[in-house]
Amino acid sequence: VKRPMNAFMVWSQNERRKIMDQWPDMHNAEISKRLGRPWQLLQDSEKIPFVKEAGRLRVKHMADYPNYKYRP
C-alpha cells in the first residue's frame, strides 16, 4: 500500500507533466530538482489548495487502511 501524497506531491503531479511534455527524455531525478525550487518559492497562501487536498487524501487513506503502518 502506498502512502498518501503530501502537498508537494499533489502540486508536483501537474507540474511534472508539464516538464515531461517539454523534455520527455529528462530523468525523474532532474525533474524533481527542477520542481523543488518553484515549490519553495510559492507563498503559503498559494500552497493552501495543495495542503487541503493532501489532508483529504490522508483522511481517506486512514479510512481505507485503518491498520496501515509505514514500513520503508
UniProtKB/Swiss-Prot annotation:
DNA-binding span(s): 1-69
One Pfam family from the record: HMG_box
Keyword match Lyase: no
Localization annotation: Nucleus
Main localisation: nucleus
Keyword Nucleus: yes
Gene Ontology cellular-component annotations: nucleus
GO MF annotations, alphabetized: DNA-binding transcription activator activity, RNA polymerase II-specific; RNA polymerase II cis-regulatory region sequence-specific DNA binding
The name this protein goes by in its record: SRY-related protein MG42
Organism classification: Eukaryota, Metazoa, Chordata, Craniata, Vertebrata
